[in-house]
């Protein structure tokens, strides 16, 4: 079975074609600058051969048509025709309260995704564009929506509700939803395997650290708490997002600076975080280099980032009544030894100690704890695309079995 995984953004379309017989990607590709000048599509095969093409990509449908051409290219493609693709899995950021798991896309699912547009205005509309484009180009191929929020639907009400008038929840669905669920689910499951324990018996704190960062407490394979909330703005400080702050800061700054609601939203989402503090960059490599040369604001930005995460690890240790492991994943979590060291230093009281040499190893599954540490520290590269492909395969196969049983 071959599954095409689609992650459609506002001006980009990431994709992977995965052969599910051995769960390996045949091709990984990206359409960039959709609807903008100088659009480009790049695709890399499993053997390393690369296709790169500059072409006009006015919308997602045209972008997907180029994906079809790339996948079936006589020289650099990986399949002879699109008939070889059995199903398509779509990343959808927000599923609201409706979806506790992935779902086969039909009219009802499409409407539910649209109903969540106001909850994820930057993400769900382009996600839906990707679905629509696929349906037009690949009619009849089963498609599955895999929701970032679904994994967090096991969080209890006392953890996901805000202490606001309850009517706001009833009217507008204002509550914590959580994000990066597909990543947290994948690494939590891998952590259980690395620990040699059944998933149901493992308690882990998963740290997805990239330009957007979130931490999740996972108990027995289920999310019980997470840092991101109603939107991905809540939680720890991030690349350009401020994370959790005193809410009274918002009207205060709006009044002092004369900002509109859209402008304050942009300030908190795109001009804050380590970028806002450092005044330099949201790239942690740049900040590391600047801090090593004595840039005090770069150092402060890194200290804030690490401190906020350290606090959450302590908090979630309490939520779980002790953790078996702390997991680091995503771009920064997998690759930055210095950030991991900043976060974990001084946590020996919680049973967390790392081996300095093992911590230097980048981008591979590894236990970087000292031999006698009570809590294991694991670095696990995330694989959201494989998780989406697995869900898509499982749901499509279940649907086929159901149809067969009904016809009998």
UniProtKB/Swiss-Prot annotation:
Keyword Ribosomal protein annotated: no
Gene name, Swiss-Prot/TrEMBL: ackA
GO molecular function annotation: acetate kinase activity; ATP binding; magnesium ion binding
Name of this protein: Acetate kinase
Entry cofactors: Mg(2+); Mn(2+)
Main localization category: cytoplasm
Site for Transition state stabilizer, residues: 180, 241
Binding of substrate, residues: 91
PROSITE patterns in the record: ACETATE_KINASE_1, ACETATE_KINASE_2
Residues that, per the record, bind Mg(2+): 7, 384
Organism superkingdom: Archaea
Pfam families, per the entry: Acetate_kinase
Keywords attached to this entry: ATP-binding, Cytoplasm, Kinase, Magnesium, Metal-binding, Nucleotide-binding, Transferase
Compartments where located: Cytoplasm
Taxonomic lineage: Archaea, Methanobacteriati, Methanobacteriota, Stenosarchaea group, Methanomicrobia
Family named by the database record: Belongs to the acetokinase family.
Entry GO terms, CC: cytoplasm
Binding locations of ATP: 14, 208-212, 283-285, 331-335
GO biological process: acetate metabolic process; acetyl-CoA biosynthetic process
Naturally occurring in which organism (per UniProt): Methanosarcina acetivorans (strain ATCC 35395 / DSM 2834 / JCM 12185 / C2A)
Cofactor binding, per record: Mg(2+). Can also accept Mn(2+).
